[in-house]
Amino acid sequence: MLAAAATFAAFVAVTSSAPDRDPDIVRKSFVIIKATPSYAEARTLALAAAERLAIRLDLRELVPDASVGLTFSQDACASEFGEFPCYVPRGRWDDGVYLSVEHSSSYEGFEEGLYVVMLASGSPRDRTIGAAVRRAKGQYPDVSVKTAPLYLGCIH
């Protein structure tokens, strides 16, 4: 009986009580200067913030699209995904500090239908996230950080 109890205790000790987690989904933090329904406003703000904060701007050659919010070019979509329009949210393999305009509908927990001026993306514990907030706070007092799950698996 004692041996069975010890075996059960050992089994419980090595068995995770947490549900299985999808290894292709990770949590990412995003430093946000502003979210707006206007792409033109978001783009103008991103350009100004890049100059004001002396931080690189990377719009990733995205353009507005009525059906998905933002899209890559028809050629890029066709060669990468086989269909148009297409959008891949920031944070998959491009973390760091740089300004971009992203579409909120691709981020779980973000208000839908907005263009988001992002200053940085990375792991929630990445020091660059806090550093980006501190750098922007003087010029953009409403800067915020949102954390969301992001799928890193195959999207073909």
Please annotate each region the language model reported.
Residues 11-156:
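Acidic/polar low-complexity segments and flexible, solvent-exposed patches
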